[in-house]
A protein has these predicted regions:
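Active-site neighborhood of phospho(di)ester-bond hydrolases with catalytic His/Asp-centered motifs
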Residues: 141-143, 169-175, 201-208, 290-294, ...
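Short acidic, glycine-rich surface-loop motifs adjacent to enzyme active sites
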Residues: 174-177, 284-304
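Acidic/histidine-rich helix-loop elements
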Residues: 76-97, 141-155, 180, 216, ...
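Extended active-site neighborhood of metal-dependent phosphoesterases/phosphodiesterases
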Residues: 103, 112-128, 185-285, 308-312, ...
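Acidic, histidine-bearing metal-coordination/catalytic regions of metal-dependent phosphoesterases
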Residues: 17-141, 162, 394-422
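An acidic-aromatic substrate-binding cleft motif
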Residues: 122-173, 178-179
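Sec-dependent N-terminal signal peptides of Gram-positive bacterial secreted proteins and lipoproteins
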Residues: 2-22
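Solvent-exposed loop/turn segments at secondary-structure junctions
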Residues: 145-148, 176-179, 208-212, 249, ...
């Protein structure tokens, strides 16, 4: 099915003084409102600066003019920003919809807010929003949530969220869905995270499965690019492919590793991205530098003898990016893709070291399992018990250390990775 995601920049022009574009705010329109608006897939998305910004997105089956209203928690001073919309075709019983985006960029650090959507005199309920206070924090990290029916993923994510109610945001490291152009799967994923993503933001990375068409051919990850309006600090011509954001004293650099899948459309993706990544990481003044990427920098040999022989070593993505991570002083690299959870410790100049970035591949959050597929790599310091099941991770940052804890679905601790720096 060919996607007809036509970009209808319907700048929902609400009659609000001083409100000219998403991000610039004014007083909310006066008059009586009814809490009868029913947006779906309401989601917060990280901003580049989460002490003062946030992106809010939602979907409706009509393309009317929408706005976002917000206030400090408990306040009667309601502000408003315009929303812009993009039409998105449905499939498999999922209706056509409009994806709305509103950007907030004048928030106060460490402050509790509430927001709601508005269409005419109809409004949604209020949702909570908290800005980054600049201190220590916790985040939930998942990867490869792609699934056959998303029931295992639903239980895993909801349990992880309930065990970590203080999480400031969550990360999905790509292959968010099994087929990136299947809107039914996207809505299944959004339904799973619905009780969390409207309260705390997501920081997604694009995976190769986001770049497959419905007939399993390579394509641009159009639905991913539509569903997540990400910080505009990457390449203007490759908006939402790669980006960076800050939380606390950590700078996160999020990469697009789908070179093979996107090559016919963006043949120079890696060259552009490498130049951007080096500049992005070097320019950050944050104490900690963390890279998020879907495809893993290491290459593994197959344990299954029926598979073609393949030497262990480093993937094309690793060969391209690891020298940049060395050069720019990256502290931690989190990856996914191989559906296995392994800690490699410090690697520098493609060798085991006592310094340089720490590399961890995070396993899987969905139910597409590869039991016994990979041999142990010479650089592996920890390998999850085999055959592997799904898992989730919790990332914590404070002044002196980063802690990444991996858990089984029942909450049993698998492993901890600790990176310290004075």
């Amino acid at each position: 099915m060919k996607i007809a995601a036509c970009v209808m920049a319907l700048c929902a022009a609400v009659s609000i003084a001083g409100c000219s574009s998403s991000g610039s705010s004014g007083k909310a329109a006066s008059g009586e409102v009814k809490e009868t608006m029913r947006p779906y897939s309401v989601r917060q998305v990280v901003a580049a600066d989460n002490e003062h910004g946030r992106t809010i997105m939602w979907q409706m089956t009509n393309g009317k003019e929408d706005s976002l209203e917000y206030r400090k928690a408990g306040s009667n001073d309601i502000r408003s920003v315009k929303a812009v919309s993009k039409e998105l075709k449905g499939d498999k019983g999922v209706s056509d919809s409009f994806v709305y985006t509103a950007r907030l960029d004048n928030l106060e650090k460490g402050t509790d807010y509430e927001y709601r959507t508005r269409q005419g005199n109809e409004v949604s309920k209020w949702y909570p929003l908290a800005t980054d206070n600049g201190g220590k924090f916790k985040a939930i990290v998942t990867s490869d949530s792609q699934s056959s029916d998303y029931s295992d993923w639903e239980k895993l994510f909801k349990d992880a969220a309930s065990r970590n109610p203080e999480a400031a945001f969550f990360i999905d490291l790509g292959d968010i869905v099994d087929n990136g152009q299947d809107e039914y799967q996207w809505q299944a994923w959004f339904k799973t995270v619905a009780d969390t993503i409207d309260k705390i933001p997501v920081a997604p990375a694009v995976g190769n499965h986001e770049a497959y068409s419905l007939d399993w051919k390579e394509t641009m990850p159009e639905r991913y690019l539509t569903h997540f309006s990400l910080p505009k600090n990457g390449d203007d011509k490759l908006a939402n492919h790669y980006y960076s954001f800050d939380w606390g004293d950590v700078h996160f650099t999020v990469l697009d590793t789908s070179l093979v899948e996107e090559k016919q459309w963006v043949p120079d993706l890696f060259e552009k991205e490498k130049a951007w990544a080096e500049k992005d990481i070097t320019s950050s003044k944050k104490k900690w530098k963390v890279v998020l990427m879907h495809k893993d920098p290491l290459q593994y040999s197959f344990a299954d003898p029926s598979r073609p022989a393949r030497e262990e070593g480093f993937s094309d993505e690793g060969k391209e990016f690891m020298p940049i991570f060395d050069k720019t002083g990256v502290d931690l690299v989190l990856s996914a893709h191989l559906h296995t959870y392994r800690d490699r410790g410090h690697i520098y100049d493609f060798k085991r070291a006592d310094h340089g970035p720490v590399y961890v591949i995070l396993g899987l959050g969905g139910n597409v399992r590869y039991p016994g597929l990979w041999k142990r790599h010479a650089l592996d310091e920890y390998v999850a018990p085999q055959p592997e099941t799904d898992n989730y991770n919790v990332f914590e940052a404070d002044d002196n250390q980063l802690v990444l804890s991996g858990y089984l679905p029942d909450g049993t601790l698998l492993h901890q990775t600790i990176v310290r720096k004075d």
